[in-house]
């Protein structure tokens, strides 16, 4: 395991050969990029989503090349304001090629998940763990290519994926 960074996360997402999967387990995040847009949404102001351009373009490129990008959001219901906000524009991600599913937290009561919570698995063999402070800000990124960790995270993701609700069918409680 070694320390990593947000820049490396972006490079890994862009550089996949086959696929990435992403498990999100928090009800709220506080990234510097997102906070101003979340604040605007809370005030009822429009957003042109230009700040998502690079991500959406990357997803389109992966889809065109036949690569897959999947995400599961583990959520508490009723949804937090943050989760309401990201759900309000999740269709942009889906239209660009990311397959997103939601799973209410109680459905995972007996499902073992890695203790760090959020992670990405790239091409089935490289894992990045994302660590957060209580207020949702990133505190650290760690990466490993240890086969046992990659296998455990991929299997955990797949078990959650099969129970999760596709974006187009998800209706929050």
Question: Where in the sequence are the language-model features?
Answer:
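PLD/PLD-like phosphodiesterase catalytic module centered on the HKD motif
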Residues: 1-173
């Amino acid at each position: 395991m070694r320390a990593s960074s947000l820049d490396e996360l972006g490079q890994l997402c862009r550089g996949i050969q086959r696929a990435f999967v992403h498990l999100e387990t928090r009800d709220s995040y506080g990234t510097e990029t997102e906070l101003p847009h979340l604040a605007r949404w809370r005030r009822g102001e429009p957003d042109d989503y230009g700040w998502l351009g690079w991500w959406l373009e990357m997803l389109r490129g992966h889809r065109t090349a036949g690569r897959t990008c999947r995400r599961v959001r583990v959520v508490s219901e009723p949804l937090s304001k943050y989760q309401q906000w990201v759900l309000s524009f999740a269709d942009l991600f889906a239209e660009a090629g990311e397959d997103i599913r939601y799973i209410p937290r109680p459905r995972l009561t007996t499902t073992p998940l890695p203790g760090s919570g959020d992670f990405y698995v790239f091409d089935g063999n490289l894992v990045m763990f994302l660590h957060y402070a209580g207020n949702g800000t990133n505190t650290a990124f760690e990466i490993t290519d240890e086969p046992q960790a990659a296998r455990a995270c991929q299997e955990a993701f797949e078990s959650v994926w099969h129970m999760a609700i596709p974006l187009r069918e998800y209706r929050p409680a």
